Amino acid sequence: MLISQRPTLTEEVIAENRSKFTIEPLEPGFGYTLGNSLRRTLLSSIPGAAVTSIRIDGVLHEFTTVPGVKEDVTDIILNLKGLVVSSEEDEPVTMYVRKQGPGTVTAGDIVPPAGVVVHNPDMHIATLNDKGKLEIELVVERGRGYVPAVQNKASGAEIGRIPVDSIYSPVLKVTYKVEATRVEQRTDFDRLILDVETKNSISARDALASAGKTLVELFGLARELNVEAEGIEIGPSPAEADHIASFGLPIEDLDLTVRSYNCLKREGVHTVGELVARTESDLLDIRNFGQKSIDEVKVKLHALGLSLKDSPASFDPSSVVGYDASTGTWSDSGTFSDNDGGEQDYAETEQL
C-alpha cells in the first residue's frame, strides 16, 4: 500500500468573516482536484436560511406603493434580499416588522422567533414619513444555493403573499490557487491556498468544515463499492505518530511507584497501549490498586497526551491532591492511602 505524507491545514484569519486556508503538501495534481471540489461545494451546497415570502399590510402585489413610505414595494423586497439570517428550525418560521414613522426601518426592527437570529441589524429596509406605517410578515426557511421567486410561490397562497428570491448560501466568495512546494528532495508537490469569505451567519472555518463533510459523504459512495480496494493511504499526523509510539512503551517507562507498577504487572498490563485500554473501574478491581494509584496513572498518561478509556478529556493534573504540576512531583511520593487501612509504604506492603 502506498502511504502519502499527511497534509496539514492552517488557517490565516484575514477579517472577521474571511480566512485563508493552506493545505500542504498534496500529491502532484491533487491541489486542483481538491481546490475545485471545495470551491464548488462552498459556493453551492452550504446550508443557510433566507426569506422566501413576505406579506405587507395593505399591499396586494409587488408593483405598488405603501402610503407614507419612501420606497415602493419592489425596493423593499430588494432590500430584504440582503437580510442575513440563520435559523435552527427545519420548518418555515415567521418574523414580523411593525414600525410607525417618522424614521427608518432597519433589520434591527425585525422581531424573530426563538432559534432565529438576524445578523445584520443595521441593514436599511425602508424610510417612513410622519404618516408612514409599515407592517411586514416575513417567512424564513432553510435551504441551499439560490431559489428564484417563481419556485417559492406556493399554490393556494393567500392574496397579498409575495414570493421572494432566496439566496440561502452563507458563502460570499471563494478563490483558490495552487503553488509548488517541496518535500525532502522533491519539488513537485502541491500547496493549495483557499480564500473563503462568508456572511455574518457562519465563519469561514465552519463553512469549510461543512464542505469537507459533504464531500466525504459523497466520495464515501464510491469507496463502499469495495472497501478493500487499494489506494493512497494518508500517513498519521505527528501527534498521532507520537501516540502510536507511546502505545508500545513498557509501563516501566512511566516511572510509577512500586505499588502501582507491581499491581499492573500482576494483572498482565505490560505496555502503555494495554493500560489505556482499561477503564478506571477495571483498575479499581485490581487488588491494592486504589483511587490514588489511578490518579497517579492518569497524571503519567496525561504527560504523554493519553488517557484511560473512560477518562474525560478535560482532566487537569493540577486538580489531583498531592501532585505538584509545576515540578511533576508528589508531596507524599512514598505513601498512598487507598482506603486499605491507613497510609503504608509501597515496598513493605506489596503483596505478590
Swiss-Prot record:
Region Alpha C-terminal domain (alpha-CTD), annotated ranges: 243-352
Region (Alpha N-terminal domain (alpha-NTD)): 1-226
Swiss-Prot/TrEMBL GO biological process terms: DNA-templated transcription
UniProt keyword list: DNA-directed RNA polymerase, Nucleotidyltransferase, Transcription, Transferase
Pfam family, one: RNA_pol_A_CTD
TM region positions: none
EC number(s) per entry: 2.7.7.6
Positions with biased composition (Polar residues): 326-338
Source domain of life: Bacteria
SUPFAM superfamilies in the cross-refs: C-terminal domain of RNA polymerase alpha subunit, Insert subdomain of RNA polymerase alpha subunit, RBP11-like subunits of RNA polymerase
A single GO molecular function term of this UniProt record: protein dimerization activity
Region annotation (Disordered) ranges: 324-352
Comp. bias (Acidic residues): 340-352
Gene Ontology CC terms, in alphabetical order: cytoplasm; DNA-directed RNA polymerase complex
Signal sequence, start to end: none
Catalytic activity of the protein: RNA(n) + a ribonucleoside 5'-triphosphate = RNA(n+1) + diphosphate
Function: DNA-dependent RNA polymerase catalyzes the transcription of DNA into RNA using the four ribonucleoside triphosphates as substrates.
Domain notes: The N-terminal domain is essential for RNAP assembly and basal transcription, whereas the C-terminal domain is involved in interaction with transcriptional regulators and with upstream promoter elements.
Family (UniProt): Belongs to the RNA polymerase alpha chain family.
Subunit structure: Homodimer. The RNAP catalytic core consists of 2 alpha, 1 beta, 1 beta' and 1 omega subunit. When a sigma factor is associated with the core the holoenzyme is formed, which can initiate transcription.
Protein's name in the database: DNA-directed RNA polymerase subunit alpha
UniProt organism field: Nocardia farcinica (strain IFM 10152)
Gene name for this UniProt entry: rpoA
